[in-house]
Amino acid sequence: MTDSEAERAERAAFILSLRRRGIRDLAVLRALELVPRGLFVDPTLRRHAYEDVALPIACGQTMSQPSLVALMTEALALNAEHTVLEIGTGSGYQAAVLSHLAAQVVTMDRYRALVGEAQTRFQVLGLRNVAAFVGDGTQGLPGRAPYDRIMITAATGEVPRALVDQLKPGGVLIAPIGAPREVQKLRRFIKDGGNLEASDLMDVRFVPLVAGVAALL
């Protein structure tokens, strides 16, 4: 079996494992199948790329386990006309998955190094509907607003008001709510007027959402 055949087999088994974990949206499963997670992990960890585990990345951050990526993506209820804002680019894996389901993905991170690496991966994969920026995630990107969907991939005590304002009426926002280093609630919000109506999805642990742009990395 060649390396490419081995990887295809590994990815097929990976998708089956996600189905067993309750992911039913075929479009989401197809998006995860199309994105080679191995490209987004450290070369020393590639043997774990298709395991359902969170993995460390640069700048002291982590990339979520695939089942959580799938669940959060499924909860957004995307269609091919949506514009999505992702807060917390990280490795770029989540944005790459979103790119196969939405018209436009805007992703941002406070770490220049992470954004640069993610942009390179997007280019390698030929993803032309993803735009990555360095910036303060608590403030979003008002110049590109409004957004149909917003995904926050870092824990926050409450959804920053700037992000609420950038979400379209009836739009969906997914975020882990709670204190750092504690169990948080992954919540799905729907914008009703100027407010958000929330429903809990599951318990999670995410790194904290930090204001500002990193000075050194």
Swiss-Prot record:
Keywords: Cytoplasm, Methyltransferase, S-adenosyl-L-methionine, Transferase. SUPFAM superfamilies: S-adenosyl-L-methionine-dependent methyltransferases (SSF53335). It is found in: Cytoplasm. The keyword Hydrolase does not apply. InterPro entries: PCMT (IPR000682), SAM-dependent_MTases_sf (IPR029063). It catalyses: [protein]-L-isoaspartate + S-adenosyl-L-methionine = [protein]-L-isoaspartate alpha-methyl ester + S-adenosyl-L-homocysteine. PANTHER family: PROTEIN-L-ISOASPARTATE O-METHYLTRANSFERASE, PROTEIN-L-ISOASPARTATE(D-ASPARTATE) O-METHYLTRANSFERASE. Catalyzes the methyl esterification of L-isoaspartyl residues in peptides and proteins that result from spontaneous decomposition of normal L-aspartyl and L-asparaginyl residues. It plays a role in the repair and/or degradation of damaged proteins. NCBIfam families: pimt (TIGR00080), PRK00312.1 (NF001453). This is Protein-L-isoaspartate O-methyltransferase.
